[in-house]
């Protein structure tokens, strides 16, 4: 079956129309990733830092059990999705080849309702992320590598 030029043009235009929502969805997942896990300003979070950040990032209704904040720059985090700072890990995930300074906030206490209390663990860790179209969209874990 041979397509005429008008039909090819229609298929091309429809294809263009379907691409932006997919990219926009990936961008929104990347923005959510940054909102949940990225904090370039702090270098060494403590318990008060965790309580403040979890509240500011709206992760306290219910109290999120665990969350990791990455204290690096966006370019280095995005580079994990490529070959500059990442390598394949455990299926379709990527692990950073360099360590990032992170603060891990763990919920302490029995109730999942506010006020939420957190214990902080700060240190350098390699991070494991999922990527879509070259952007990090999910932080799976952080690994201490001596």
UniProtKB/Swiss-Prot annotation:
Annotated disulfide bonds: 50-105, 63-116, 81-131
Name of the protein in question: Angiogenin
Function comment: Secreted ribonuclease that can either promote or restrict cell proliferation of target cells, depending on the context. Endocytosed in target cells via its receptor PLXNB2 and translocates to the cytoplasm or nucleus. Under stress conditions, localizes to the cytoplasm and promotes the assembly of stress granules (SGs): specifically cleaves a subset of tRNAs within anticodon loops to produce tRNA-derived stress-induced fragments (tiRNAs), resulting in translation repression and inhibition of cell proliferation. tiRNas also prevent formation of apoptosome, thereby promoting cell survival.
Subcellular location: Secreted; Nucleus; Nucleus, Nucleolus; Cytoplasm, Stress granule
Regulation affecting activity: Has weak tRNA ribonuclease activity by itself due to partial autoinhibition by its C-terminus, which folds into a short alpha-helix that partially occludes the substrate-binding site. In absence of stress, the ribonuclease activity is inhibited by RNH1 in the cytoplasm. In response to stress, dissociates from RNH1 in the cytoplasm and associates with cytoplasmic ribosomes with vacant A-sites: ribosomes directly activate the tRNA ribonuclease activity of ANG by refolding the C-terminal alpha-helix. In response to stress, the angiogenic activity of ANG is inhibited by RNH1 in the nucleus.
Signal peptide: 1-24
A Pfam family of this chain: RnaseA
Subunit structure: Homodimer. Interacts with RNH1; inhibiting ANG ribonuclease activity. Interacts with PCNA.
Key words, A-Z: Angiogenesis, Cytoplasm, Developmental protein, Differentiation, Disulfide bond, DNA-binding, Endonuclease, Hydrolase, Nuclease, Nucleus, Protein synthesis inhibitor, Pyrrolidone carboxylic acid, Secreted, Signal, Stress response
Keyword Transcription part of the UniProt annotation: no
SUPFAM superfamilies assigned: RNase A-like
Source species of the chain: Saimiri sciureus (Common squirrel monkey)
Record-stated family: Belongs to the pancreatic ribonuclease family.
Cellular component per GO, a single term: extracellular space
CDD domains, alphabetized: RNase_A_canonical
Encoding gene per record: ANG
InterPro entries named among the record's database cross-references: RNaseA (IPR001427), RNaseA-like_dom_sf (IPR036816), RNaseA_AS (IPR023411), RNaseA_domain (IPR023412)
Coiled-coil regions listed: none
């Amino acid at each position: 079956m041979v397509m005429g030029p008008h039909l090819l043009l229609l298929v091309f235009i429809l294809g263009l129309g379907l691409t932006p929502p997919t990219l926009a969805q990936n961008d929104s997942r990347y923005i959510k990733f940054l909102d949940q896990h990225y904090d370039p300003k702090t270098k060494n979070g403590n318990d008060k830092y965790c309580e403040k950040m979890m509240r500011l990032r709206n992760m306290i209704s219910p109290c999120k059990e665990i969350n990791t904040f990455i204290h690096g720059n966006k370019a280095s985090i995005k580079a994990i999705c490529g070959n500059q700072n990442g390598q394949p890990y455990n299926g379709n995930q990527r692990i950073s080849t360099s360590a990032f300074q992170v603060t891990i906030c763990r919920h302490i206490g029995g109730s999942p309702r506010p006020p939420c209390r957190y214990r902080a663990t700060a240190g350098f860790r390699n991070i494991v992320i999922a990527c879509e179209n070259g952007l990090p969209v999910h932080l799976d874990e952080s690994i201490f590598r001596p």
